[in-house]
């Protein structure tokens, strides 16, 4: 059945369909709805962290334990989580993980403008950039397969248009 979804809902749906067991995030617009939606799936243990670094480290722990995990935060949160991100980038994964940063190149709901694609480049991470809600579902699912196949962390950075503004039909 087709259903209308925001990008944040679609990211959560993709993680659920990929078999994610653990989700962590620090709340902040425009990424809050990702964990809120993940928490509606009883198969996923979802928790708010006291900051973005702790959210990242919790997801690392889940991955090291062999669980598929996801961590999400707003764009400026990646500044706080950069230290564990760079360490994790060369550690590899036991259980697949996807890092989602809700970038805001146009300052729609945040105090500053930041484009986190440079973090993926600097950490030498594979990055997927969905263009609509259906791609959010599909790319998040594919990220787990790719990450586990190549023993690497995957990074996704959807734009505000994809996450919040457009409501695209999704097959989920």
For the regions a language model picked out, list residue spans one by one.
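Residue-level marker of positions within ordered structural domains that often coincide
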Residues: 28, 148, 161
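Hydrophobic alpha-helical segments, chiefly the membrane-spanning helices
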Residues: 166-172
């Amino acid at each position: 059945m087709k259903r209308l979804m925001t990008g944040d809902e679609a990211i959560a749906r993709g993680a659920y369909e990929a078999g994610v067991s653990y989700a962590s995030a620090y709340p902040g617009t425009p990424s809050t709805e990702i964990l809120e939606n993940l928490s509606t799936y009883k198969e996923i243990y979802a928790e708010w962290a006291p900051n973005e670094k702790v959210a990242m480290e919790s997801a690392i722990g889940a991955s090291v334990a062999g669980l598929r995990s996801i961590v999400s935060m707003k764009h400026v949160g990646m500044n706080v989580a950069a230290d564990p991100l760079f360490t994790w980038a060369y550690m590899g994964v036991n259980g697949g993980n996807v890092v989602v940063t809700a970038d805001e190149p146009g300052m729609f709901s945040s105090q500053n403008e930041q484009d986190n694609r440079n973090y993926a480049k600097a950490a030498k991470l594979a990055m997927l950039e969905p263009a609509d809600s259906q791609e959010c579902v599909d790319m998040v699912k594919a990220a787990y397969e790719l990450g586990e196949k190549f023993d690497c962390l995957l990074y996704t950075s959807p734009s505000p248009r994809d996450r919040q503004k457009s409501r695209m039909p999704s097959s989920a």
